[in-house]
């Protein structure tokens, strides 16, 4: 304790460490030089770590520690070592190098064995030996620096002690170029050395993984486009095909022999149903539909649905020459084509004969028998208008064809007991052609019947009553027939085409019954005779019009039949009047199905009056034409009853005795059925439903403005006050 200047300690043994600690407190001056040449002085301790020195530089200059790199004797100082470890004494100069802001973009360690061999394609052939000089046990690090769109790669070897050295000891540049495809365009990666040496050298560009992915995406997109195109073609091919267009053709089966009655029954036309109904067999056919269709559609079952049925008119006429001569001779002498019908569809007289229904001939009455005993020289030929070849054929909505009833073989000499089947119309399924094709076909019934006075073409009610699903179709004719081109010769007798029952004892009654249909009972709302037209839907005859027709018929019975202008067929007259009433309706519910039966509005013709006139009657042929109304849409009469000039009369018709039927109201705009609470009558005079009852919804034609002015004028009359005398 001699030296009083020293502080006292507990013992003398601590003097050694005491001097050591005093030596630790010594400081020294260091000079820090930057790359720009700026130099500043820093006082540090020799036992201070490098990171503490960097912290002092950060406090002095504001440079972040992560960006500071101190280099002394070409060696970077580690953060964990002291200055004394590097033998840095007082007065030494340390170089301060600033790192890139944010650090390297990507640092990836690549083993030098196999991956570097695979990456040799990215290197020049002269630089492959650079990788061979390196040890396989060491790792190679790529320092990536970004300058705009250019990436600089600096390969270096990790020595394992935390230091990175260039891959080549010499100043040889180890740069290589990678071609990278980016989203915004192509950007080139240029290589450089650790010493910022940039030179232009040969490049080898290869598409990277992103480029390959883009190529694969384009290939996949092309495949998807091809697949979508194929799917679109498949969807187009799955669309329903158009209706198969079938031309009218004669029946396939040969005509029945003279002594057979059963084949004549089954050689009948199939009833063409409406859309939504099943094909029902012909009237009077006791066999299944397969047997009933055997005579008519034997050829149709052998042909495909997509092919047109070829006409076999020639073969059929060659097979039966007698029928051909008979039909052609009587057709040419009795029935002539109206001038409105073009001769384009009928190529020759054979097709003309096949297209016309020939119900009778001009043979003597003693040899005329219908369906009972048919002579070989006289064939009662019924030509089908069309056959249901496939279910895919879309038939237009037409009335069902009237069919033959059974004949009675016991009364061959006296006439017929059954009914004669009538081909009512010739159909075409190509309705999409604007109904131009039906204009070129004959649709008339040649009601030329010769024989006894009791021979009348009828439709027996007893044959029709068991078949609830078969309906009578109204007669059709393509053009109005005149008196001279539609009837037989004046010396021939003509028959009247009627509906009813035929009494064999020369007493006839015209009994028109109501044939109900199970399918039509659900949809038909009106009762009346409906007349089908080719261009429009069926129309309905009201009760008042039916009474008018009956009165006109009674008046016509007292006059000669030869007055053509005074007689109008009941269906054609009603069709022209009721068409104007129903033409403005828009709903489908207002218009009923085309094929429907005769209603009870024309029931119970007076049997006694008909019996009185039946022995002397020689009835006339009746023709109906809907061509004028269906095609032209005019308001003229649909057809005329054309009769031969004779002195005989039509039977008187009694007005139908029927109770009132409940009428239903429909909306004038949409056709919706309206009840008692949902019927609204507008001031324009029409009935509307709840949604269309307002004037702005149905376009009311009532002038509300003028009516309002009138009401205001009546409620508020103009009052002229008397002038007050001046005072």
From Swiss-Prot:
Zn(2+) 2 binds at residues 682, 684, 698, 700. SUPFAM superfamilies: AN1-like Zinc finger (SSF118310), Ubiquitin-like (SSF54236). Residues 238-248 have a biased composition (Basic residues). The keyword Nucleus does not apply. InterPro entries: AN1-like_Znf (IPR035896), AN1-type_zinc_finger (IPR053061), Ubiquitin-like_dom (IPR000626), Ubiquitin-like_domsf (IPR029071), Ubiquitin_dom (IPR019956), Znf_AN1 (IPR000058). It comes from Homo sapiens (Human). The lineage of its organism: Eukaryota, Metazoa, Chordata, Craniata, Vertebrata. One of its GO terms (molecular function) is zinc ion binding. Disulfide bonds: none annotated. Keywords: Metal-binding, Zinc, Zinc-finger. Pfam families: ubiquitin, zf-AN1. Signal peptide: none annotated. Residues 187-217, 238-264 are annotated as: Disordered. A zinc finger (AN1-type) spans 661-708. This is AN1-type zinc finger protein 4. Zn(2+) 1 binds at residues 667, 670, 689, 692. The keyword Transport does not apply. Gene3D superfamilies: AN1-like Zinc finger (4.10.1110.10), Phosphatidylinositol 3-kinase Catalytic Subunit, Chain A, domain 1 (3.10.20.90).
């Amino acid at each position: 304790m001699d030296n009083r200047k020293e502080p006292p300690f507990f013992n003398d043994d601590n003097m050694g460490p005491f001097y050591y600690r005093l030596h630790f407190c010594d400081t020294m001056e260091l000079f820090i030089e930057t790359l720009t040449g700026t130099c500043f002085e820093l006082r540090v301790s020799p036992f201070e770590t490098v990171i503490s020195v960097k912290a002092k530089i950060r406090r002095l200059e504001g440079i972040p520690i992560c960006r500071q790199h101190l280099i002394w004797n070409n060696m970077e100082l580690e953060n964990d070592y002291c200055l004394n470890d590097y033998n840095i004494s007082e007065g030494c100069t340390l170089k301060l190098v600033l790192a890139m802001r944010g650090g390297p973009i990507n640092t990836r360690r690549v083993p030098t064995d196999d991956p570097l061999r695979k990456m040799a394609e990215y290197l020049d052939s002269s630089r492959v030996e650079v990788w061979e000089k390196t040890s396989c046990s060491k790792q190679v690090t790529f320092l990536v620096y970004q300058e705009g769109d250019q990436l600089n790669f600096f390969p270096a070897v990790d020595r394992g002690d935390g230091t990175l050295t260039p891959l080549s000891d010499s100043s040889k540049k180890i740069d290589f170029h990678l071609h990278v495809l980016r989203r915004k365009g192509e950007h080139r990666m240029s290589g450089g050395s650790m010493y910022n040496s940039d030179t232009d050298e040969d490049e080898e560009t290869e598409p990277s993984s992103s480029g390959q992915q883009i190529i694969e995406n384009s290939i996949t997109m092309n495949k998807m486009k091809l697949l979508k195109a194929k799917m679109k073609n498949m969807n187009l091919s799955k669309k329903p095909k158009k209706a198969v267009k079938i031309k009218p053709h004669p029946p396939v089966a040969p005509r029945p022999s003279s002594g057979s009655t059963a084949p004549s029954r089954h050689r009948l036309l199939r009833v063409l149903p409406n859309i939504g109904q099943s094909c029902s067999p012909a009237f009077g056919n006791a066999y299944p539909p397969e047997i009933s269709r055997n005579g008519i559609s034997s050829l149709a079952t052998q042909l495909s649905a997509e092919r047109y049925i070829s006409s076999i008119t020639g073969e059929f006429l060659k097979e039966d020459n007698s029928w051909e001569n008979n039909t052609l001779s009587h057709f040419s002498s009795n029935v002539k084509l109206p001038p409105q019908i073009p001769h384009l569809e009928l190529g020759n007289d054979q097709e003309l004969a096949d297209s016309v229904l020939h119900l009778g001939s001009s043979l003597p009455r003693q040899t005329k028998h219908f369906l009972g005993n048919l002579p070989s020289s006289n064939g009662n030929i019924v030509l089908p208008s069309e056959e249901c070849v496939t279910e895919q054929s879309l038939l237009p909505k037409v009335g069902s064809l009237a069919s033959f009833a059974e004949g009675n073989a016991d009364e061959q000499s006296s006439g017929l007991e059954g009914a004669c089947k009538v081909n009512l119309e010739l159909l075409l399924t190509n309705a999409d052609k604007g109904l131009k094709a039906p204009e070129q076909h004959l649709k008339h019934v040649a009601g030329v019947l010769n024989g006894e006075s009791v021979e009348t073409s009828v439709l027996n009610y007893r044959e029709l009553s068991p078949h609830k699903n078969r309906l009578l179709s109204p007669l059709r004719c393509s053009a109005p027939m005149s008196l001279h081109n539609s009837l037989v010769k004046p010396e021939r007798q003509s028959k009247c085409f009627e509906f009813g029952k035929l009494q064999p004892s020369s007493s006839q009654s015209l009994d028109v019954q109501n044939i109900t249909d199970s399918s039509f009972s659900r949809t038909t709302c009106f009762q009346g005779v409906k007349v089908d037209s080719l261009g429009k839907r069926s129309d309905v005859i009201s009760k008042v019009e039916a009474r008018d027709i009956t009165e006109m018929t009674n008046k016509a019975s007292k006059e000669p039949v030869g007055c053509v202008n005074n007689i109008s067929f009941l269906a054609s007259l009603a069709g022209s009047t009721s068409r104007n009433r129903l033409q403005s309706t828009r709903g489908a519910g207002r218009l009923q199905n085309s094929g429907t039966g005769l209603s009870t509005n024309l029931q119970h013709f007076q049997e006694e009056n008909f019996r009185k006139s039946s022995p002397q009657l020689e009835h006339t042929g009746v023709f109906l034409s809907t061509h004028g109304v269906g095609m032209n849409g005019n308001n003229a009469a649909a057809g005329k009853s054309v009769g031969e000039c004779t002195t005989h009369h039509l039977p008187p018709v009694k007005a139908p005795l029927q109770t009132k039927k409940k009428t239903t109201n429909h909306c004038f705009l949409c056709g919706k059925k309206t009840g008692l609470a949902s019927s609204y009558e507008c001031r324009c005079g029409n009935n509307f439903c709840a949604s269309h009852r307002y004037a702005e919804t149905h376009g009311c034609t009532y002038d509300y403005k003028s009516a309002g002015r009138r009401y205001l004028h009546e409620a508020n009359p103009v009052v002229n006050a008397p002038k007050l005398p001046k005072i």
